[in-house]
Amino acid sequence: MALSIEEETTLGDEFFAQVQKYFTVVEDDFLNDYINRVGKYLSEAIEVNPFPFRFYILKDGSLNAFAAPGGRIFIFTGLITETDRLPELAAVICHELGHVSARHLSARVDQGKKIGLATLAGILAGVLIGGPAAGAIITGTMAAGIQTQLHYSRNDEREADQLGFSYMRSAGLDPGSMVSVLSKIERGRWMGTDKVPAYLLTHPTGPERMANIDTLTREHPDLAQREEALRLAEEYPFFRASVLALHMDSSDAMRSFRAEIKKNPESAPGYYGLGLIMKQRADFAVASEYLSRAMRYAPHSAAVSRGLAEMYQSSGNTEDAIALLNKVLEKDRDDKAALFILAGCYQSKEEHEKAVSIYERLKAFPPVRDDVFHNLGVSYGKLDRLSHAHFNFGFFFKKKGDMRMARFHFEKARELSAGDKEMLERIEKALQPKPRGN
């Protein structure tokens, strides 16, 4: 018998709290928007799902990805950078969607819920995450017995592969990529004879599993192209380059981008990645050169335009940044990454009304970056709207888990909001404990 929907929701929230203790959840509008667009596109083939799917990137070099209770799916930066094409990443996500839609984890977890959902969440996090963090997460004498029953069986893997294959075909993506990405994960054993990639510890693999996928691919050779798949595939090299440049070792990333450019001197993702690294190092002249080359080879890439605009902003050239961002927003007015950079440009120009307008708009597009609340607090303060400034600083600290500072700012906001019934109600609501998983 599987967990009830309510139980799985609670377990999912507890699980997410464990993940946040041990890992950095990537906060990047472009990366989060892209991974959720991909995930939601792939999940369209699932007819019934009791939970909204949410996709997260964890900053960690491990070759790992996993589905957690309550519809959350986590992908590690290390696995993203090992994939070369969208279909390889999609294959991993579709496999995890298969586990979710078949309720594999829910059925296994139900057997252990007698120990309490909070304790179970910790054990489950250790099982799925693996690696050095697992030992710290899994505690208590009951863990060992329960730990083994939480791993997926070979039958679970077979069913998830079959479902994942179906989702890949529905999305118009090559299901054969399931074999190529599994081969890459298998090769991850180079880390050492006693160190198996975390993904393989919870997802049994082997020649039989790969042969089954290969057979399915040969039996269903025809594949219909879909426009959204083509759009996502076109953006993928820039998504991967961003992950590699901003969230992996920069020296390794530089070598990778230079090798890519050596193979293809007109590699826009290669120059884009180098530009991001040099911007991080505050070498704006070199960053500008690389990003301008990327723009020359990919003039319609929103990612490259945003990268160049952010470099302009960082180097104090806000007017050029604003002009470039407005071009991006002409094509997609809800581009969160472009809006965030644009708001920062207006802040640096002391045009705080414009900055506030954009940041308030960004609050309507979850997940909301923590620094949206911080920056709103700054701009409201500059406008002498102090109750709103303290209110947003309160939210910033609440999201960071610092309830002492959060209460200080919420109380200050309450003092300054006498007579404003709507604002006082918002403050009272904000003073309630933070819902898990936000």
Language model segments and positions:
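Active-site recognition of the HExxH zinc-binding catalytic motif
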Residues: 75, 91-99, 103-104, 160
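Catalytic Zn2+-binding segment of zinc metalloproteases
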Residues: 87, 97-114
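Terminal, low-structured helical/coil segments at or just beyond the last alpha-helical repeat
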Residues: 382, 391-438
